[in-house]
Amino acid sequence: MSIGVQSSGINISHAGLSRLVDAGKSEQGDKAVRDDGRALARADAALAAVVGERVAARRDAVAGSGAQRVELARPKPDAQTRATDRRTVSGLEREHKRLAASQTPRVTGMHDALVQRHVSLDGAKAAHGEGVKRAAGDAPRAAADAPQRFAFADDKAFDAMLALGAAMQKNVQSDLAMQGKLTMLAHDAMMSAAAQDRSIGAAQMTAAIAGGALQATTSLGGAMQQMKSLSTKSMSIEKELKPQAELKQFHAEQALELRGINKPVLSNDEVSHVKIKRDTGETVRHEIDHGGERMSDEHASVLAQEAPARQHRIDMHGMRHEENLVKAGRQQMKGDLLQSGGQIGKNQIDGASAQQQGADRAEQKEDENAQQTAMAAASTRDEAAHRSREAAQKAIDAAKSQVANDNAVAAQVAGNLRT
């Protein structure tokens, strides 16, 4: 047992006084209860004698300066506060086990230091229980002689509590910094996901514009080829079919003349000739037989010679018309191919755009997952920091309570000494 006088620098250590005090706790049963009062009385007497002698000597030495005030150091708490101390530290230990891995090493060391100071107490209790089983008479004396330390009754323990609070504050700052980083990561992931959305929209717009332009171009080219095909057919009808029809009509008329049908006859004014205009524009004059029964031999010979040439021209008009139809068909096919090629190109552009959009969506999913992971990590970090702050607050509250208890005990002892 130690008593320190802080203002005067007195530090008194009395082993006999400790043995007298501890002797009152070594007895059991009714005898322990009876002897407890005598032991406490002897302890008070010894305490008063020792303090009186040392204080009187000190008072004589400083009588000239008028210093009469004596301050006592904080004594150890009694058995009631020890149970409170143990419960408090047990709570700190449980909180320490529940803390996340985000704690700084200094905070963990402070918790371990506080818990370690009470491990010796638990070991002493266990040794006491085993000693009772082995020898009922020797165990109480061994337990009384064994040193017992309580964290909240030691000045170093209070320093540890204060260091714990400071370390927890630093840990809070570290948690805030980490939460800020995680929030920035989540923000960056969100911005990247938004950029992927814009990229998908741009890819869709590009595909739509390119596909539309290609399809419009090929459709226009195909329409122009189809127009050429129709124009070729129209030209063939105008230049080939119409002349062919006129030649066929003239050829039929000449054939009728050769057969004597609708042959020319003399009119009332007795015209002796007739003029025939050929398809070349040349006008040929033929004499008419005054008998009116048949054509002249010269007329029939001319008509017979011109018939094969007219038939050849009729056949050539038909062949050229067929060639024009073939040309128009090729133009029509080219137009259809252009339109089909435009549709195929548009489908290819849509496929490439869909592939790019799929890749962008995959990256977007990755960014969203990264954002969710960062937010979950930030939430976990915040929860761990909250638990750390709660544990630190409990430790600080326990230290404050212990200080108040020690002050009350010191005031009571000082009052007893004055009386």
Swiss-Prot record:
Subcellular location: Secreted
Protein's name according to its UniProt entry: Effector protein BipC
A GO CC term attached to the entry: extracellular region
Family that this chain belongs to: Belongs to the SctB/SipC family.
Superkingdom in the source lineage: Bacteria
Keywords of the record: Secreted, Virulence
Tagged with keyword Secreted: yes
Region (Disordered), start-end ranges: 62-91, 338-402
Keyword Thylakoid: no
Gene designation per UniProt: bipC
Bias kind Basic and acidic residues: ranges: 71-91, 380-392
Gene source species: Burkholderia pseudomallei (strain 1106a)
One Pfam family of this chain: IpaC_SipC
Main location class: secreted
